[in-house]
UniProtKB/Swiss-Prot annotation:
Gene source species: Solibacter usitatus (strain Ellin6076)
Listed name of the protein: UDP-N-acetylenolpyruvoylglucosamine reductase
Catalytic activity, as annotated: UDP-N-acetyl-alpha-D-muramate + NADP(+) = UDP-N-acetyl-3-O-(1-carboxyvinyl)-alpha-D-glucosamine + NADPH + H(+)
Superkingdom per UniProt: Bacteria
Entry's EC annotation: 1.3.1.98
Pfam families for this protein: FAD_binding_4 (PF01565), MurB_C (PF02873)
Function of the protein: Cell wall formation.
Amino acid sequence: MRLAGIPNLAVSASTPLSLYTRFGIGGPADLFAETRDEGAFMAAIAAARESGTAVMVTGGGTNLIVSDAGFRGLVVRFADDTLSAEAERVTAGAGAVLQDLIDFANHRGLKGLETLAGIPGWVGAAVYGNAGAYGHSISERVRAVRFFDGSAVRIFDHAQCEFAYRESIFKRHKDWIIFSAELVMDAGEAGELERTSADILKVRNEKFPPTMKCAGSIFKNFLITELPPPVAGLVPANVVREGKVPAAWFLEQVGAKGMRFGGIRVADYHANLIYNAGEGTARELCAVIAELKGRVRERFGIEVEEEVQYVG
């Protein structure tokens, strides 16, 4: 595979993917390439295909669980973190840190993202998974998404993105790679927006300290309308928030809090927070996830669904 001649592409060999995941877990990639340039990214993908090399695309690595064996092939990281604004429209590169986008908008008095403060990861992943908090999701502000479908660069408008709760069309087409997103904001008062985000960030950092090796919540919450009626009837009314039941409630009922296996822990204060306490492995993390899924299935007859993605 010929990568050396591609401009604006940094390439390394036998790169530990644990350096690029929030869990701090994962074996080496045979080859690791990083770029902020769309042309270099597409050239790297083409080179891998021509040589028959397996390829994986990553971003901030917040929601990735990488095998202890790593990845046999090429890992490409698209890291364009450009942010720009024109009136009430903001364009964000997929490699921009979501919090940086929020700060950028708040500082300019652009309202609409302030409640997403503290959600880890990059903009591309936030759009991909329709990240949200406090009753709001990033999709509310997305006007258009620019992406690579494997052969050409395309632009989808909001409707074409098919957003739903923690879902988008990009989740169903994992070979489509988001390059950037255009967002439409409302006019607001910068100081008020910054205070709102600061308050939310303080609460989130108490639950998910920035230094903690975790992906935030592991499992998706449930829409109360999608639960079987007998199960929905078991949920206390005060647990349901904005039509959703926290996965943590089900996990708490099956004894998740404080669970330990090897270097992996479930927080004793939050049943949906699994973290690497130091020397945890992907095998141990997957074992804990599987155990919790099995307990909820046996007790309630429902499936808790991961927000994380598996590699290798």
